[in-house]
Amino acid sequence: MITQNSIPEVKEDFIGYALNERRIRLPQFRDLGPADLITLAKYLPTSSNTNAINSTGGNSGAITHAPAADGSAASMVTNGDTSDAAITTNSTAASIYSNSRSANDAAPMVAELHPLNKLKGEVGTFFYSMGVDTSGPTSIAIFLKEISEIITEKPQVWFGKKKTFNVARISFSTWNAFRRCDINVIVHIPGTIQNFIVDCNGESQNIEMRADHDLIWAETFVSGVVRSIMLMKENAEEGELQNLVETLILNPFTAGKIDDVPEMFIDLFPIIYHKGPSLGAPYYIANVTNTNNYLVETLVEIVKLTRSVNRAEIMLKNLATENPEAIIILIKIFLVCDLEIDAIKLTYDMLSQGEKTINTNNHMGYRSELLCLQAQFLIDKRQDYALGQNIAQEAVNCSPSEFRPWYILSKVYVKLNDIENALLILNSCPMSPLKEKYVLKRVAPLHSNNSLHLPLPIDVVLDEVTSLNPQDVQKEHRSADPMLVNLAASNLKSTFQLAYRLLTEIVQITGWENLLKYRSNIFVMEDEYQNSSSSLSKGVNEQEEQPLRAKRLCERWLDNLFMLLYEDLKVYTLWQTEQLYMDAQNNNHNKLTFEWELFGLCARRLGHFPEAAKAFQNGLSQRFSSRCARKLLEYCINERQRVKIFINSPNSHDMVPEMVSSRIRELDNSIIDLCVKICCWNHRWYTEFSISLLDSLSVVIQDMGLTKVSNEISSRYPETVLKLVQENLLDFFKNVCTNGCYDA
């Protein structure tokens, strides 16, 4: 649901600023690269402007070559807010259009925008985007035309003043992560359409003149889809938050202008398969392989969401005739789609045939992947920890430099209550401190917040969500309890975040005092080790040093996690004690929503999920908080799954069926409410796509059906809210998932 008020914009210092900044930074882009960039040149319609535009307009819709190196006369167009000043001036300080320009100039990026005519009130703006269909120049041009029509359809509230803008030019830049080059499409209105490549050296070339132009567009399309999916998946723990506020995030599954996006991605996968490692891999993977990279992660996520298992299975089995390791991807898909019998059978077949199946240089790496999948299944689904331990140990032997096998082995020792071995294995995990999750980063720096145009989407109003004042929230953040705000464990990243989660599972079993005893029994601290070394050099009796020699040196990062755990436990205990006292006195808890949020996150990190959920509920009872809502939604989904599992357990006869039904109904209502509110909040901040919301709502839809869920929302919320949820969530299940998994 894109409207004028749902498009964030940044005012440029001069027209072409954002494109030029992007061109300068092309050599710095790594792996998946930046978000797509959209730039606009807007002007105030006057008779002189209209004549100027018409006199330079070309053949509308024609496809032209890349900007030539011998362009037209030099001019610089700078931004202006006033409606009564023509502000085009000649200069060489900014966006240059010169007869003697080289490929490295800004001109090829800016592409001579009516250089000989002064347009009144002209202003350059830009914003970032994700999820746009980049399968070809036509689909991009259709999207750009939609954006320009939205901008010009009615007067725009521009920094407090209503202005009627026309769009002279609109451009789209997207990163082809496989070739490390930028793909540009520029639409002149009225006039021509240009599409060209700009490589890391600043050289530009027309795409259509290349023999491999179809492959280039296929790579560009896949790059865009992978970015959209991985942005959400990699930041799921952080609530899919991203700090680049001037970004319009669309649903890549429903943004297709010509073809079905999920089907197209699956069909193109074999063509791009061998290039997958060039995209990089999640933060916990050290050695990127054909089956362990962002491309594969995206395919698995797409099939899981759309339930396109049959199409993916046919494609992967065909691919496996020449690339046997591709079966590993199919096993991953079977596991996430609850086809566990098929997955385990395939895993067994591949492991039993060994090198006959996978005859590659990375045989041990692929074997380790299979063993990890098998061990994870035994731990999570079968609770066969003894067998899981043997398999995880074999996975470590196959890939000793990978984090995941060590992590699984440590996890299975925790399940076996073998705390000493769990800690020793955790201490041995190969950490990756420099590898980060995929996040969006600003390509064109903001020189001032005054250049940000962040309209409030007024097409959807849900008072408790959309009326929230960001300044009030910031004030609340500043006055929150410093003890909660400064908890360093909340800032843990990458593999350290996973290691901390294991440590909290251990302390739940042992308690803090016993954990310290385990630590002192098996580890020697770094300062203790240094002191013992100096003692030996001074001739201290070696027999006194024997106990130290039997211990392992505790890694500094693990020692730091112990300290962070102590801080979390201390704060949690203090807050719990205070709450119990207040409850006993029948007094109200005088806490801020932000404080409830921080306490809930602390409790969640420590594995106290019911207490965390209660804290999030307390916070939401005072005002809306997107983080509280997301974490409470996660709890409701997990609690619903727990109840479902309990129904099928031998102890289920102790629970009255009516009680089970009532609990499931209560959780379903909470899930629907939270999904709707988070969807409205996302729309407020220009985000129309969320994997976590699709995942959460799918659980309810599978039981209730699409029509009933839609009716539930319709009965509780205004029509505009229903329309938003329909477009952003429900239409996905209706139009994209057409294989009967989600009945109406």
Label for each model-derived stretch:
Residues M1-A744:
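Non-TPR docking regions that flank or precede TPR/alpha-solenoid scaffolds in eukaryotic proteins
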